[in-house]
Amino acid sequence: MGLPNRPGPLPLLAVTVSVLLSSCSAGSSAASTSGSTPISFPTSDGVRLSGRLFGPADAVAGVVLAHMLPADQTSWFPEAAHLAAAGYRVLTFDLRGYCPGGDGGCSEGQKDVNAAPTDLTAALDFLRSDGPTRVALIGASVGGTAALMVASGRQDVPAVITLSAPEVLDRLAAGPDILTNISGAKLFIAGLGDPAGAATSAQYFYDQSPQPKRLEIVTADDHGTDLLSGSQGSHVEQLIDVWLATYLHPAEAS
């Protein structure tokens, strides 16, 4: 779906951050973690993050799920269970400073949105060390922006999916220098009525990125992982399933 002409670059204003964060729900811890394993891993700057592994330990394809704010990894648990049932090894984790509780413990450090790419890089490297040879990144809101930044310049990320990722948030920015260096297959998903303007950002990401890529603007007001539980949830989940099956989990993966 096309959009009107994109306005100029988004200003780095506190109001932009507050509007974006207020549009994100806190995420529910009610989702089952049956069959998953709590783990932790360090970042390059020495912060230990809390996470959880879902899916078969011998899977050759994996997925890292990066959460939106002010939610935590529990917002991804339903999708993690769904992907695990499809045969993927899935890692959810909490960005530094986030603590949903439970047997997984808390991520260390102070909350810092600008450290999201550092945290996600550590999560990606951890999952690859766990066994999967092909690992995709899926991020909601700021997790999506971080996913684009982490995938840029790396040849070991065959697929990236963003749900309502902003182009700019505080000091994080996914501009042309980032987007043109992502070799993996990119799927940008956003709701047309998202009050944070995610549809405009998704169109921008699509316009600036090389192939393979796809833009999906759905008729919804939901933001981030809320797209998976909203009126377009089944459609969004199917988009993710097909993208991963096409670019991450080919029969010849080994």
Residue ranges and their predicted role:
Residues S75, E108-D130:
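Alpha/beta-hydrolase active-site loop
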